[in-house]
Amino acid sequence: MRETNGKNSGSVSPHAWRQETEGTFTAEHGSEAGRSPAGEWPTAGWSTAEPERMGMDSGMLADTIRAFRDRGVRSLVVVRAGMLVAEAYGAGLQPGTPQDVRSVTKSIVSMLAGAALADGRLRSVEQRISDFYPELKNDPKTSQLRIKHLLSMTSGLAWNNAGDQSSIEMMHSEDWVQYILERPAIHMPGRVSTYSNGDAHLLSAVLQQAVGMPLADYAQARLFGPLGITDYRWNADPQGIAIGAWAMALTPRDMAKLGWLYLKGGEWDGARVLPKKWVRESLQRRIVHHYKDGRKGGYGYYWWLKPLVPGLTGGDSSKPSPKLEAFYAAGSGGQRIFVIPALELVAAFTAESPDGEMPEELLNGIVRSIRSETPLQANPEAACRLTQAVSSFKAQPQNV
């Protein structure tokens, strides 16, 4: 196991961000449209840049980090246009410390489903689960269960989230997959959405059968290896099946790598890690989700989708504020990988907070620090404040 590094590998020239077709975003660098700044591909570690060089205000970032120091945040990493501009870690944590990301694991399972499709290990998302578990053919409901239903949590299998009852029962069972398969089918697949750790773990079991090896090994070969991710853990159930609903630990820098891969449409350093088509499909809204603040978002294939509060970014007030759409991986307690393609921004958080609104509030503070699409003038005083805020954050006791 090695610790990734964030050494600065070079300077960053002025560049402007532009939206490309089909929802992918690249950068313009000099006179060569589409060329991105140095450090875009952080396989060996993120290159760093002062926030001002990436159009961000160090002082505002410092204020945000200080404001959230006492709100249960354990660590945060901020990347813009392929450059690490800020990171902070609580006491006892280092950049190379893998942390429990909980249900962020589900989004990674979605990525692996895309890889399995690309490799021909799965025929399509229309493939029936009974191809892998023939006993499902005996029920008229479960006989119609397909991979797409597990990915969108519309299996129709009963799952009780009150007090995590079904998840706890599954964990106490001798065979987790058998527990899931024995759940009563209360809806036809595709009709009703129920957040289900059972659906995610059953998909992991299906993938493990499809690829013919432990899913953690497949993840290393097809996803983590190409991205240079080596410091991670992924626990398995009693039968050796990687737990699809939670149980992965990653470093925040590596969480940001996964977000960057998706921002780039599945491409990594000139290689196609995931099909662009899969990235688009997994981010397509399958389920409408109404947030508490009234905004309408959704759920794709284990990815959450949400429009952000308008008017967050600074800059030229004579120009209309861009409509910002985010997609993100989420785990309980505040684990997040946020991606905002229009800003070429990735933010990864780990936390232990009961406040469900905290992660987006932290993200909003980061977005507000974006003042320009071109570099700002260097601000040594603000840079000093940011350094102090990071040091103060590290001094804050954390429940690790």
Annotate each language-model stretch with its function.
Residues 1-99, 117-123, 152, 374-400:
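N-terminal leader/targeting segments and the immediately adjacent pre-domain N-terminus
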Residues 13, 17, 326-399:
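Structured C-terminal helix/loop/strand segments within mature extracytoplasmic catalytic/sensor domains
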Residues 82, 99-125, 150, 203-207, ...:
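Active-site SXXK
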Residues 94, 183-189, 199-201, 237-244, ...:
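Flexible glycine/proline-enriched surface loops and loop-helix/loop-strand junctions
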Residues 99, 139-141, 188-195, 243-249, ...:
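Solvent-exposed loop and edge beta-strand segments that line ligand/cofactor-binding
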Residues 100, 119-157, 182, 211-246, ...:
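Active-site helix/loop module of the DD-peptidase/beta-lactamase fold
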Residues 199-206, 246-267, 335-352:
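Active-site-proximal alpha-helical segments within enzyme catalytic domains
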Residues 229-231, 284-346:
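Active-site Gly/Thr loop motif
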